[in-house]
Structures are given as structure tokens and as C-alpha cells.
């Protein structure tokens, strides 16, 4: 019984050391290279390793040469069994105001080995709240949107892609 306890303690120490010394910055830059063919670029950011995570401060997000947003901070937590990307409050670029209200309070993307077939997404802001899942096996996306009064007044064209629910919200379902 004592040796089992020692074995588990050493396994935990080994796992913590792997997480701490994981080359997070090079992995981040490889991820950026993977996004480039999709025309998604994050520029002028400052990347810092926080030990068990990665912090990206500042930066401008572009999609197909169009400025989408000015980001204040992203926190990436790659813990192997539980991975999280937390996006701090940010403002959309002036060109995006016809698509969404300007301020996003925050967003979170979570992947866990305890639910390996789904990625959870949650966001909130002047547009309301959004929560959903992305299915990795069935390749389906499902998002529920509770729109704010400001979004209802704006009536962006993309809201027509959502189906109205009985609760007064909207649902988007699609395959990819």
C-alpha cells in the first residue's frame, strides 16, 4: 500500500513537471501557423509563459485582412486532461459594429478528456449570452443565444441563420 502511494505521488510530480516544462510558446506559434491558411491572424501580441499556462497580452485579430477586434488578454491553460482558452473583455473593430454590438465581456473555450467528443463554448457581452458545443465526432455545432435588447434592435443579417426558440432565445445548429 505504501509503494502504491509513492508511485502515485511520483506520477503526479512527473505530470506536474511535464505540464510546467511543456513548450507552450512554440506550440502557440505552431497553432498560429495552422490558422494562417484559414486567413485568421493575430498580430502585435505579447506571449508569456506563466508556468502552467500561457498568457497572450494585447494583439489585433484579423480575418482576411479585415481587422476584427483589439484583444486585451487571452489565457490558455493546457493541462492535458482539461484545456481552456479564456478571452478577457475586448472591443470589436469599428468595421464590425454592423455585425455585433461593440463590447464582448469575455469568452471561454473548454476541452476536457472527461467529455472528449465535445468542445464547450461560452461568451457574453453587449450582444447577450451565447453557449454551445462543437461535436468532434458527429461534426455538429449547436449554439444557444439569449440576445440582448441592443442585438434585437440591431437585427444583424446573421441572426436569420438562428432559429427562434419557445423561450425567446435563438438556436443555431449546423454541421461542418
Model-derived segments and their meaning:
Residues 39-117, 122, 126-128, 146:
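N-terminal beta-strand/beta-hairpin edge segment
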Residues 2-21:
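Hydrophobic membrane-insertion alpha-helices, especially the h-region
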Amino acid at each position: 500500500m505504501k509503494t502504491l502511494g509513492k508511485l502515485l505521488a511520483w506520477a503526479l510530480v512527473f505530470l506536474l513537471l511535464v505540464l510546467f516544462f511543456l513548450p507552450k510558446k512554440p506550440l502557440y506559434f505552431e497553432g498560429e501557423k495552422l490558422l494562417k491558411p484559414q486567413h485568421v491572424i493575430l498580430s502585435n501580441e505579447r506571449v508569456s509563459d506563466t508556468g502552467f499556462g500561457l498568457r497572450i497580452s494585447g494583439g489585433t485579430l484579423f480575418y482576411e485582412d479585415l481587422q476584427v477586434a483589439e484583444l486585451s488578454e487571452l489565457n490558455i491553460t493546457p493541462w492535458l486532461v482539461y484545456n481552456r482558452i479564456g478571452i478577457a473583455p475586448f472591443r470589436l473593430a469599428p468595421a464590425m459594429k454592423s455585425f455585433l454590438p461593440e463590447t464582448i465581456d469575455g469568452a471561454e473555450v473548454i476541452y476536457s478528456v472527461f467529455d472528449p467528443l465535445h468542445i464547450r463554448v461560452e461568451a457574453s457581452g453587449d450582444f447577450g449570452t451565447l453557449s454551445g458545443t462543437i461535436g468532434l465526432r458527429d461534426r455538429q455545432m449547436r449554439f444557444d443565444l439569449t440576445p440582448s435588447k441592443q442585438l434585437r434592435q440591431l437585427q444583424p443579417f446573421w441572426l436569420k441563420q438562428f432559429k427562434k426558440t419557445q423561450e425567446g432565445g435563438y438556436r443555431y445548429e449546423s454541421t461542418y
